[in-house]
Amino acid sequence: MITALLGGVGLSTGAEAAGGAGNPAVPSGGLLAAAASGPATGAGAADLNAWSAAQRVNDLKRRAHRLPVIPAAAPAAAVARPSVQAPTAAAGASVLVLYDTTGPYGYLGELYAMATANLAGHFGTVTAKPVSAYTPGMVEQYSATFYVGSTYYGGSIPDAVPAAFYQDVMTTAKPVDWIGDNVWNMANAVGIENFKKKYGWDPTNSYFSTNGSVGTINQVTYKGQTLTRKIPAGADGGVLHPALSGAGYPQVTQLALATDASTGAVTPWAIRSANLTYVGEIPFAYVSESDRVVAFEDLLFDALAPAATERHRAFVRLEDISPGSDPTELRTMADYLASQNIPYGINVIPVYTDPRGVYNNGTPQTITLAQAPDVVAALQYMLAHGAVLMNHGYTHQYGNVNNPYTGVTADDFEFFRSHVDAANNVVYDGPPAEDSTAWAQSRVTAALAGFAAAGLPRPALWTTPHYAASAADYRVFGQNYTARLERPLYFAGTLSGAPVNPGRYIGQFFPYAVKDVYGTTVLPEDIGNYEPVPVNNHPARLPADLINSARANLAVRDGVASFFYHPYYPVAPLQQTIDGIRALGYTFVGPMDLAN
């Protein structure tokens, strides 16, 4: 399972499988991560567990009418905080993303809002701001509005949602997607019967628990696909069970259904009536390539591109190619892919270095592309047979230390520090001490010089080594390349304008190209990679697993099944994967096609 990432421990989030001569691996990453432990900021599994516990307690109190809610104060100028507007994407929608900021875990709201804003960046221009900064009529300025309710208001936490937002949702004809908490406060604010008459259900009688328990909801069914929901014990805040009003009230469309493994009970996971789409949980924690987040990724089309044509494309890239690679293996891969008329990407590291001789009998070794003519010839052969050159870091390792494995190219992180803990988890320690815009640019400049010195074209695409870097680094990459193809990290402070907190972040993968909150086009990598052996507490990932993830992603009406493969593995597993994905109806395209 790919877990979520909230600072500290990388339980696979944001990292792509390692290569190198010894081929250790960091499994491919996920979307919000719950760390096994966290940094001094307090982010990690403890916070997610505490948040879910508070949610369960508040839900029981609300059911017992013991959770008084203090309404939001009238807005004042001092309440307004900076909003972040991403560049306009290919389509023309305009999107407002509102999020919570108060309570002991208020910072989660910004992380979830970034995940929502990034997905919305596939469709057009995105503006994100705290819900407390909402002003009357704002919903009318956008094609659609998304509210991510992550703070369960009540008791000692006053409602931060302005009354104007509740009223505007009720009166606007514009689509509103409400995710998670506080829809019951809207019903109380506008009148329960008024809410029922428009939407056909009663949030004030809808709860996350049944008979005192949130149950064991482990799957969501959407558009014929069974998606997983794997929440660790003690970390599940539940899925809201909407109380549908029935006869005499508007019909409610049940868009997705959740199943409780312990009872077999089925409840709506997402519903729609009138202008309101409601999703019964925030789907960004504990996700995988076949997770219920896939349903949410498709639901955005209903609000932002309802006329989108069904289209299913696939993409494969060959990973961790360096001056130390075997040119015969590269040509073998090129011949197979060319025989199948499959365009593909080649992620190339321009400098191979083994600073302590880990794989060279103790003798340090460094090889540039210019010093590896056979590899360069193989790369040119690949480019002539359907490949697109991509830049995968400068050295794909850091200094002469284990980070976290060997210090050798393709094994280790380059732009983030890490270590492996006693439980065999990869722990994300944060950016290097010398991290800065200038430092990142110096490595990019050196990498590009390495390609030029070998007579290769300048790559237009970038993939961060193991996907992990600081916010400043990601922006540098975006300034030097047409697009990034990866599963990035997004740090607290990016939306709010506060200093970026390197210990609090969310990792995310995408089923389609997006304009992210860093202002860069990010191309999808969403079904992972072939990995024949378990590593760092993650199971092997075989062709059948990749194919199953591609099948789940058929639920996204214009989605991409994007994966990567290391050329030091045999051709057969790659062939099995490609054949299986093609059999599902996917068409393989090149990386530059993914932006369209």
Specify the residue positions occupied by each region the protein language model found.
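Aromatic-Pro/Gly-enriched surface loop or interdomain linker
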Residues: 32-38, 42-142, 310, 337, ...
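C-terminal domain-boundary segment and adjacent tail
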Residues: 124-130, 298-310, 328, 332-355, ...
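A glycine-rich, often tryptophan-bearing local segment used as a flexible ligand/cofactor-contacting loop or short
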Residues: 151-231
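Metal-dependent polysaccharide deacetylase catalytic core of the NodB/CE4 family, i.e.
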Residues: 184, 343-470, 527, 560-563
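Catalytic beta-strand/loop cores that center a nucleophilic Ser/Cys/Thr
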Residues: 209-274
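Catalytic domains of cell-wall/extracellular-matrix polysaccharide-remodeling enzymes
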Residues: 426-514, 569, 573
